[in-house]
Amino acid sequence: KDRDLVTSIDQLAGTKNRVTGTQLGRIAMQLMNLNPVPVAWEETIDGLKQGLIDGAETWASAVAYANMAPVVSQSVDLRFFSGNEHCGMSSKVFDSLDGPLQDAVMESAYLAQVQSQAANEAALIKTVGFSDPQLPDTIFAENNVRTAFLSDEELKKKWVDER
């Protein structure tokens, strides 16, 4: 909580960060000069509390719902993973439907995705407090979690190959 607000990916170099089991996450962290540490999700909060890890690859909403906000001082928006939800249906079942019903399922799935994404985006600001400035009475505001939104120029340093 006593560190300056992160404004550069380089400020995170050398930190130990919980990484999911994905190769993409590990590779992305290595490209940012972070030290990816495989830690089970259920052990992440204890790792943060005990100082075994400096941070975690996760989303702001996960910090809020997993009650990590009391031990997190900053939420740094690195924009290297998207937060996607998945809902599936058996292809055999879908293929057995008549054409108009398949169209209705596809339209319903699309509209459900639009609605849930809009609700998630609103909750990030109104409930979690993942905004600058933060709204009062959000989980981040109540726990003094600062949000660090890096500039587009800063993000391009790591994510855009300008060759």
Predicted regions and their residues:
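N-terminal secretory/targeting leader peptides
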Residues: 1-163
